[in-house]
A protein has these predicted regions:
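Helix-rich cap/lid subdomain of alpha/beta-hydrolase
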Residues: 93-142
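Conserved HGGG/HGGXW glycine-rich cap/lid loop of the alpha/beta-hydrolase fold
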Residues: 1-45
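Conserved alpha/beta-hydrolase "acid-adjacent" motif
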Residues: 185-191
């Protein structure tokens, strides 16, 4: 698919921010000739804010849409709802299919929200840093502080947000390019495989968490490599 001149709108994951999702996708998309937009998350209205950003951008023409984790969920749902406005979907680290229930990403978001409410930002951040790789600790320390004090609400809303199920993904008109880590316990590669198996035109490329930690652009690179197969 030729992306030259296309506009790509990329949505951040829960607790993450527009800075990270931009770095994850901008380099590969710019190399392909696309314009990249990464709207800042609005933690008090995370899902609604993302959908409004997509609707606003689509007024100028069809979009490449995508994101990471809950950003991928919102993007693929928007593409299902607006089949005439979505050129392609770039889904990084999809978190679940259908209802979140006990999906690891949903459980992690609920747990973190509870810690933040109980212990406050400083203590919860210190606990996160103690149990995270350095690269992730740096990213989340910044993005959590930016979204405080509304971060717990955003996490809880995301953890309860339903993704399209397999039957709904079967109706996706746009090509779906999925990128996932083979060793991510929070975003299992099995979810990515479910999305790819369900959508009519879909492909998956993978990487490791070590590769992601070294360069977030592996997400965008993997998505564009998957898209090139379609």
């Amino acid at each position: 698919m030729n992306l030259r001149g296309a506009t790509a709108v990329l949505l951040a994951g829960t607790g993450s921010d527009d800075d990270y999702v931009y770095r994850a996708f901008a380099g590969p998309l710019h190399d392909a000739g696309a314009r990249v937009v990464a709207p800042a998350p609005q933690p008090r209205r995370l899902i609604e804010g993302y959908r409004e950003a997509l609707d606003e951008a689509a007024r100028s023409g069809p979009l490449v849409v995508g994101g990471i984790s809950i950003g991928a969920v919102v993007s693929v749902q928007w593409a299902l709802d607006r089949p005439d406005r979505a050129v392609a979907v770039l889904a990084g680290l999809p978190p679940w299919t259908g209802t979140p229930d006990d999906a690891p990403a949903a459980l992690a978001a609920r747990h973190t929200a509870a810690l933040l409410r109980r212990d406050g930002l400083a203590a919860a951040t210190a606990q996160m840093r103690a149990g995270s790789p350095e690269w992730l600790a740096v990213e989340l320390t910044r993005s959590w502080a930016e979204q405080w004090p509304d971060l717990p609400e955003a996490m809880e809303r995301a953890a309860g947000h339903r993704a399209p199920d397999a039957a709904e993904l079967a109706g996706l008109a746009a090509p779906l390019a999925v990128a996932a880590a083979t060793d991510d316990p929070v975003h299992p590669v099995e979810v990515a495989l479910e999305w790819v198996a369900a959508a009519p035109r879909a492909a998956l490329r993978t990487f490791t968490l070590a590769e992601l930690g070294a360069d977030p652009a592996v997400i965008g690179q993997a998505c564009l490599a998957a898209l090139a197969e379609l």
